[in-house]
UniProtKB/Swiss-Prot annotation:
CDD domains: FMT_core_Met-tRNA-FMT_N (cd08646), Met_tRNA_FMT_C (cd08704). GO terms for molecular function: methionyl-tRNA formyltransferase activity. Keywords: Protein biosynthesis, Transferase. Transmembrane segments: none annotated. SUPFAM superfamilies: FMT C-terminal domain-like, Formyltransferase. It catalyses: L-methionyl-tRNA(fMet) + (6R)-10-formyltetrahydrofolate = N-formyl-L-methionyl-tRNA(fMet) + (6S)-5,6,7,8-tetrahydrofolate + H(+). This is Methionyl-tRNA formyltransferase. GO terms for cellular component: cytosol. InterPro entries: Fmt, Formyl_trans_C, Formyl_transf_N, Formyl_transf_N_sf, Formyl_transferase-like_C_sf, Met-tRNA-FMT_C, Met-tRNA-FMT_N. It comes from the Bacteria.
Amino acid sequence: MRLVFAGTPEPAVVALQKLIDSDHEVVAVLTQPDARRGRGRTLHPSAVAELAQQHGIEVLKPTSLKADTEDGQAIRQRLAELAPDCLPVVAYGQLITKDLLDVAPHGWVNLHFSLLPAWRGAAPVQASIREGDQITGATTFRIDEGLDTGVILSTIEDTIQPTDTADDLLTRLAYSGGDLLVETMTGLEQGTITPRAQEGEATYASKITTQDAQIDWSKPAEVIDRHIRAHTPGPGAWTTLVDARLKVGPISHSGEVEVAADLAPGAILAQKNSVVVGTGTTPIVLGNIQPPGKKMMNAADWARGVQLDQEAKFQ
């Protein structure tokens, strides 16, 4: 099939590469405009744009798809000229307006990193870890006017591991989901897919803010563990000590915590080779900490450097 791929960040690159390597033809990509990154705040193309350029694929970077904008009108004209059979989408980042939904015979097909209708919205991977799901996956569905409400085309499952961070899980789903997207394109072309409506109660995973990532030490240890992993690497789980904000990496699972179980929530006990923190249930051993303006470091090394007193407590 002739495809126009819509996507922007690194996870979308995996799917795009798999489509390029498939029997389908990617005739153009839609991606977000160049954005300022790095210390110099210089403009850089998206990860998807870079890959497309390497393969000589046309790159379209509209600031908006709305019909009443200059970019929106130009995109409509170009899509009509390209005449795609389908527009696969992975984390594009722009609203696809109603009048564009029927621009191709097979419409727009989104790869979403959850088993819909679970975790509709912007942060399904983080939500599935944070809420303690054991099984998640990826779904391809046809985009309609709702928020991730379209008919399901294909799914694939994945088991969430006890130490998975959001980055770990997203990386796996990007690869398995990329394969699923290729299979979906082939199935649509061959007429072997039967779309089905989403069934069951929907849950929602809204975009995560920095404030959402703050650790509440009064929560049970397993909840804090999931919270930290769900926000690793971004935006990064964090806590405060006095007036300093520190990012906290995934906890250590290397051994048992040999301290009194009544360590108060947030209370810090620095041992020779570990840092233990009280929670609402049992204490946990920190893995890494990132002080302001520094790189992530071993928690025990951090504790030796700041010389914690006996009353030290995370807030």
